[in-house]
């Protein structure tokens, strides 16, 4: 639970919301409709849960105008309750409290630059030429390679690895176990076996980017791998060398993006999507979960390729029939030709 406390009036001012009730009423956490107590703020973002307003014990309710009359307690009336909930969540997140200084167990090279108000946690390693911007926080066990640059107010949770030559903008948040700047999968075949292509590019990440845990973003072969401003990336995502992801795009868990793919701006890629290399995806393109993207997309829109779930016996029959499609196409062509003759 957060140690923060806010009055109805303070929250209304923060959101520029219409306030109804006791201006001095105080809450100290955010909770779901069903479990919220008198010390909690709750919210209604989906009308299908509107009936719960009648029994909710929340001290303050965040909701839209068309639902306001159905809650009799203290309330904040806004146009978009879900967006406002997101904004308030930062206020109640006590884990964001900042620290300053370098932990005694950290190793910081003499040629690295660390802002006075940054924090370097236990057992971190900062190599020569690295730059850590103002207000940036590194959790325990983070590694920052040579000449890597972090902007202001970044947050790296424990055990994040940034190889040499990586650049982060401002307000980049990276969760534990993520590796940025490892070698791309580049090898040239020869009679003697695979010959490694050393990856000479870097990774450039823009401002206000969030990256989940155990995600891997490879460095470029020659040019950089680029993640533009405002991109959000989930856990367990693999982004290969020289990929470019446009501003404002969202990549869900277990997505794999092959080398040199270009994802446009404001795209959404649902879980388990696989994107082929060396293709370009238009801005505002949306892929449903499990889609296998084998070619580029020139027109924005929603795309899907994975078959929906079926009862297993039906799926088996359809799988057999799928294997017979080519045979049936040839039979249909023969019948059509016979009719013409």
Curated annotation (Swiss-Prot):
Catalytic activity from the UniProt record: a UDP-3-O-[(3R)-3-hydroxyacyl]-alpha-D-glucosamine + a (3R)-hydroxyacyl-[ACP] = a UDP-2-N,3-O-bis[(3R)-3-hydroxyacyl]-alpha-D-glucosamine + holo-[ACP] + H(+)
One Gene Ontology biological process: lipid A biosynthetic process
Entry annotated with the keyword rRNA-binding: no
CDD domains: LbH_LpxD
A GO cellular-component term linked to this record: membrane
Pathway: Bacterial outer membrane biogenesis; LPS lipid A biosynthesis
Keyword Hydrolase: no
Keywords, alphabetical: Acyltransferase, Lipid A biosynthesis, Lipid biosynthesis, Lipid metabolism, Repeat, Transferase
Pfam entry (one): LpxD
EC annotation from Swiss-Prot or TrEMBL: 2.3.1.191
InterPro entries: Hexapep (IPR001451), Hexapep_transf_CS (IPR018357), LpxD (IPR007691), Trimer_LpxA-like_sf (IPR011004), UDP_GlcNAc_AcTrfase_non-rep (IPR020573)
HAMAP family: LpxD
Assembly and interaction partners: Homotrimer.
Family to which this protein belongs: Belongs to the transferase hexapeptide repeat family. LpxD subfamily.
Name of this protein: UDP-3-O-acylglucosamine N-acyltransferase
Organism: Saccharophagus degradans (strain 2-40 / ATCC 43961 / DSM 17024)
Higher taxonomy: Bacteria, Pseudomonadati, Pseudomonadota, Gammaproteobacteria, Cellvibrionales
């Amino acid at each position: 639970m957060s140690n923060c406390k806010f009055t109805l009036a303070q929250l209304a001012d923060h959101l520029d919301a219409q306030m109804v009730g006791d201006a001095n009423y105080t809450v100290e956490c955010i909770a779901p409709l069903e479990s919220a107590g008198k010390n909690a703020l709750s919210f209604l973002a989906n009308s299908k849960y509107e009936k719960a307003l009648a029994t909710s014990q929340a001290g303050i309710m965040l909701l839209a105008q068309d639902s306001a009359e159905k809650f009799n307690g203290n309330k904040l009336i806004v146009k978009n309750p879900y967006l406002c909930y997101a904004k308030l969540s930062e206020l109640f997140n006590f884990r964001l409290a900042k620290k300053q200084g370098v932990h005694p167990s950290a190793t910081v090279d003499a040629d690295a630059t660390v802002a006075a108000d940054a924090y370097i946690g236990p057992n971190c390693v900062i190599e020569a030429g690295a730059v850590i911007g103002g207000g940036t926080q590194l959790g325990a066990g983070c590694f920052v390679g040579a000449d890597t640059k972090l902007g202001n107010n970044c947050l790296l949770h424990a055990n994040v690895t940034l190889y040499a030559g990586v650049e982060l903008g401002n307000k980049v948040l990276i969760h534990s176990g993520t590796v940025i700047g490892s070698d791309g999968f580049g090898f040239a075949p020869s009679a003697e076996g695979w010959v490694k292509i050393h990856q000479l590019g870097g990774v450039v990440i823009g401002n206000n980017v969030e990256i989940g845990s155990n995600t891997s973003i490879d460095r470029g072969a020659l040019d950089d791998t680029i993640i533009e401003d405002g991109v959000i990336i989930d856990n367990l995502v693999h982004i290969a060398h020289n990929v470019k992801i446009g501003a404002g795009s969202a990549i869900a868990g277990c997505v794999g993006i092959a080398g040199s793919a270009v994802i446009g701006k404001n795209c959404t890629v649902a879980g388990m999507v696989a994107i082929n290399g060396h293709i370009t995806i238009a801005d505002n393109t949306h892929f449903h979960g499990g889609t296998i993207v084998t070619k580029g997309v020139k027109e924005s829109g929603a795309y899907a390729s994975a078959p929906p779930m079926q009862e297993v016996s039906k799926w088996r029959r359809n799988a057999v029939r799928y294997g017979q499609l080519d045979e049936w196409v040839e039979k249909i062509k023969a019948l059509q030709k016979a009719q013409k003759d």
